């Protein structure tokens, strides 16, 4: 799909501004029959601001087909506590859940486990997450926010320390803070704070080495459901992927659940890959969490 748009904002404080926005995206889904008759499906996509950045359509199809075929013969595993390696797309999902707790609206509603924790070291030194609306050519890039405030780069986590929340003018006023230029809005919606381009800063470890450091564990490629409580940080999601044995991918895994607490998960990130990958306006590398509960048989 393609879209060409123009965002313009005029407000009662005398602000006038506009900027163009283009998007192009392609998604491919593949379906295969397993030996027991179950349907296995996988997909891949590419979404960019310009055509020259879009992944080759043939490559998108090949990745979708491979991700589907690799699931054939998937099975459950016994309940255990093991390391879990998040592929980049799954790391982006985890980051999205986390940053949803770092908005001013979550703070003033009392719906975040990060309340009263600004400045606290919650994650390992490998955890650095930024929201950067000034990156050239990215989906969330914009010169001003939904209230006409000049945008800026905001470091949400730096070397494991939680730096603070993303605010628009309203939530900043409600909580006694200053706006971070993070207001988002639609044509018919009121502003609310949210991220622009989220980046989990990569490390320097190849993903193969991260997997190779696991004796027994899960390589996560699928998450299902919405089992995350932002107020408490309790995390529980349906999951699938591949079992790791002696540092190698052994077999596909399905119908399991992974669970933990978000702050404990951040404190358990012991490896961050060099493979930073973009998915829309968010980017993350491979991550490894030292231990999560994998519930299966």
PLM region descriptions:
Residues 9-15, 91-99, 231-235, 294-297:
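Short glycine/threonine-rich loop-to-helix capping motif typified by GTGT followed
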Residues 100-124:
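Amphipathic alpha-helical
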Residues 3, 32-37, 158-159, 244-246:
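Short acidic-glycine loop/turn motifs at beta-strand connectors
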Residues 21-98, 102, 273:
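Internal alpha/beta scaffold segment
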Residues 115-297:
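Dual-mode signal for accessory low-complexity, basic/Gly-rich regions
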Residues 25-26, 43-51, 102-111, 171-186:
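Extended active-site and interfacial segments that coordinate phosphate-rich ligands
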Residues 1-24:
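Hydrophobic alpha-helical hairpins/lids featuring a short glycine-rich hinge
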Residues 1-6, 81-87, 120-131, 135:
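Active-site cores enriched in adjacent His and Asp/Glu residues with nearby glycine-rich loops
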């Amino acid at each position: 799909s393609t879209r060409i748009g123009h965002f313009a904002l005029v407000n009662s404080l005398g602000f006038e501004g506009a900027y163009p926005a283009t998007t192009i995206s392609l998604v491919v889904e593949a379906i295969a029959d397993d030996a027991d008759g179950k349907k296995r499906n996988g997909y891949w996509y590419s979404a960019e601001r310009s055509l020259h950045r879009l992944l080759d359509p043939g490559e998108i199809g090949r990745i979708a087909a491979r991700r589907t075929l690799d699931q054939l013969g998937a099975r459950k595993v016994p309940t255990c506590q093991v390391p879990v390696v998040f592929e980049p797309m799954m790391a982006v999902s985890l980051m999205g859940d986390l940053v949803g707790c770092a908005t001013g609206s979550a703070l003033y509603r009392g719906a975040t486990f990060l309340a009263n924790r600004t400045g606290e070291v919650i994650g390992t030194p490998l955890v650095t997450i930024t929201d950067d609306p000034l990156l050239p050519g990215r989906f969330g890039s914009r010169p001003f926010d939904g209230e006409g405030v000049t945008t800026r780069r905001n470091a949400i986590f730096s070397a494991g320390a939680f730096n603070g929340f993303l605010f628009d003018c309203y939530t900043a006023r409600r909580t006694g803070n200053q706006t971070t230029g993070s207001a988002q809005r639609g044509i018919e919606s009121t502003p609310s704070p949210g991220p622009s381009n989220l980046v989990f800063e990569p490390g320097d470890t190849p993903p193969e080495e991260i997997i190779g450091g696991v004796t027994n564990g899960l390589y996560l490629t699928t998450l299902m459901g919405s089992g995350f409580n932002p107020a408490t940080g309790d995390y529980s999601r349906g999951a699938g992927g591949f079992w790791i044995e002696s540092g190698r991918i052994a077999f596909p895994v399905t119908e399991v659940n992974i669970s933990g607490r978000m702050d404990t998960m951040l404190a358990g990130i012991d490896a961050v890959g060099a493979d930073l990958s973009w998915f829309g306006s968010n980017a993350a590398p491979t991550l490894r969490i030292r231990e999560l509960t994998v519930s299966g048989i």
